[in-house]
Every structure is written in C-alpha cells, then in structure tokens.
Swiss-Prot record:
Maturation-removed propeptide residues: 23-43
Cysteines paired by S-S bonds: 49-59
Gene name of the record: RNCT
Any one annotated GO CC term: extracellular region
Signal peptide: 1-22
Subcellular location: Secreted
Entry keyword Flavoprotein: no
Tissues in which the protein is found: Expressed by the skin granular glands.
Residues modified to Lysine amide: 60
Annotated keywords: Amidation, Amphibian defense peptide, Antibiotic, Antimicrobial, Cleavage on pair of basic residues, Cytolysis, Disulfide bond, Fungicide, Hemolysis, Secreted, Signal
Protein name per UniProt: Ranacyclin-T
Domain of life, source organism: Eukaryota
Length: 62
C-alpha cells in the first residue's frame, strides 16, 4: 500500500511540474506579441507502413 501511495504521489508531482512548464511557456508566448508560429509537424518515420492487412506489406520509404 505504501508503494502505491508513493507512486501516485510521484505521478501527481510530475503532472504538476508539467502543467507549470506549459503555463510558463504559454505566458512567454503571450509576452512575445501573442503570435502563434505554425511549425510543420514531421510525421513518424513509419507513416504509411502500417496497414490492416496481414501479413504486413513492406514499407516504401520516401
């Protein structure tokens, strides 16, 4: 029971730290003039390789 409480406490702490960092970053972005810079999101290297067919088809690289 003690290890479960300890684990939950660590997860709670990490969540609070993560939330705090997100708030700081958002505040910093607002101070820069409120502009949101769009960045191209690179998709995973295996995009298009995974199909619902079995056996899986080989991946054709880009």
């Amino acid at each position: 029971m003690f290890t479960m409480k300890k684990t939950l406490l660590v997860l709670f702490f990490l969540g609070v730290v993560s939330l705090s960092l997100c708030v700081e970053e958002r505040d910093a972005d607002e101070e820069d003039g409120g502009e949101v810079m769009e960045e191209e999101v690179k998709r995973g290297a295996l995009r298009g390789c995974w199909t619902k067919s079995y056996p899986p088809k080989p991946c054709k690289g880009k």
